[in-house]
């Protein structure tokens, strides 16, 4: 049986349609501030990438956005009826209980056999349908997780390190698939990623997060910014052309904002 690919969704041509707003978000764990003064708007059909140092609050920010974590202060506003697809940073599979890809996808509530077949086709993994989840490569697993995330055709895809465990060629293919997915579903995508050399060619806006939003901008504005070099390192900046934005501050080694000249 030949499976037709997903039919593109025409929700609206408005690119200014707001899906999610975060207003004055703060998150504190045991008196330690994880996020402060976060203001963020996610628009329909946009791709936003969150970058920053380990421990800077990127995954915490996604959890707040998903309403999986209640902020200590601030508001999280979702468009009424917003459908969200989520790919977590890690998936823990019990190797004593093998499960096929098709069965794994079917565990998602209210999904149909045709929708599973269409998702497998979209991500070019039809041949993996009867394979064990536990035996998939990193790239194959990420494609399966993405296929599962779009089964109910979400308006927003939230991805936490979607390229983790995927080789360079696989990362390029996956980013192409994400761009294709945005076109088919007319959805927004927000992701956390460390793969900056590929990210910058495949995103509309970048947020640098280190407890707060240090800076935000489009990829093409950043390549020569001295603060970008300070944040990510001189050698990295020399090898890759990126977006330009402006910090009005620096961080010390503990992630705190420096007052005056920063010696870090």
Curated annotation (Swiss-Prot):
One of the record's GO molecular function terms: ABC-type zinc transporter activity
GO terms under biological process: response to zinc ion
Stored Pfam families: ABC_tran
Location in the cell: Cell inner membrane
Designated name of the protein: Zinc import ATP-binding protein ZnuC
An example Gene Ontology CC term for this record: plasma membrane
Annotated catalysed reactions: Zn(2+)(out) + ATP(in) + H2O(in) = Zn(2+)(in) + ADP(in) + phosphate(in) + H(+)(in)
SUPFAM superfamilies cross-referenced by the UniProt entry: P-loop containing nucleoside triphosphate hydrolases
Domain ABC transporter: 20-235
PROSITE patterns the record matches: ABC_TRANSPORTER_1 (PS00211), ABC_TRANSPORTER_2 (PS50893), ZNUC (PS51298)
List of residues binding ATP: 52-59
Enzyme category, top tier: translocase
Membrane topology according to the record: Peripheral membrane protein
Keywords: ATP-binding, Cell inner membrane, Cell membrane, Ion transport, Membrane, Nucleotide-binding, Translocase, Transport, Zinc, Zinc transport
Keyword Cell membrane: yes
InterPro entries assigned to the protein according to its UniProt record, in alphabetical order: AAA+_ATPase, ABC_transporter-like_ATP-bd, ABC_transporter-like_CS, Metal_Ion_Import_ABC, P-loop_NTPase
Family: Belongs to the ABC transporter superfamily. Zinc importer (TC 3.A.1.15.5) family.
Primary location recorded for the protein, binned into one broad class: membrane
Gene (name only): znuC
Subunit structure comment from the entry: The complex is composed of two ATP-binding proteins (ZnuC), two transmembrane proteins (ZnuB) and a solute-binding protein (ZnuA).
Enzyme Commission no: 7.2.2.20
Function, as annotated: Part of the ABC transporter complex ZnuABC involved in zinc import. Responsible for energy coupling to the transport system.
């Amino acid at each position: 049986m030949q499976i037709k690919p997903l039919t593109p969704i025409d929700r609206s041509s408005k690119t200014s349609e707001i899906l999610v707003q975060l207003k004055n978000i703060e998150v504190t764990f045991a008196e330690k501030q994880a996020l402060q003064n976060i203001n963020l708007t996610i628009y329909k059909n946009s791709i936003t990438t969150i970058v920053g140092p380990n421990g800077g609050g990127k995954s915490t920010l996604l959890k707040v956005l998903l309403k999986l974590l209640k902020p200590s202060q601030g508001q999280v506003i979702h468009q009424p009826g917003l459908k969200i697809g989520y790919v977590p940073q890690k998936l823990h599979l019990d190797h004593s209980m093998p499960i096929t890809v098709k069965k794994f996808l079917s565990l998602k509530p209210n999904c149909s056999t045709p929708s599973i077949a269409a998702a497998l086709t979209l991500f070019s993994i039809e041949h993996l349908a009867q394979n064990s989840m536990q035996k998939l490569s990193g790239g194959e697993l990420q494609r399966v997780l993405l296929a599962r995330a779009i089964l109910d055709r979400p308006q927003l895809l939230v991805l936490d390190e979607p390229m983790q465990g995927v080789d360079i060629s696989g990362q390029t293919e996956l980013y192409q698939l994400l761009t294709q997915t945005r076109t088919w579903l007319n959805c927004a995508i927000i992701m956390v990623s460390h793969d900056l050399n590929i990210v910058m060619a495949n995103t509309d806006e970048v947020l640098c997060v280190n407890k707060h939003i240090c800076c935000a901008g489009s990829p093409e504005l950043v390549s020569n910014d001295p603060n970008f070099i300070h944040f990510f390192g001189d050698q990295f900046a020399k090898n890759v052309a990126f977006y330009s934005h402006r910090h009005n501050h620096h961080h010390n080694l503990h992630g705190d904002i420096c007052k005056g000249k920063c010696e870090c």
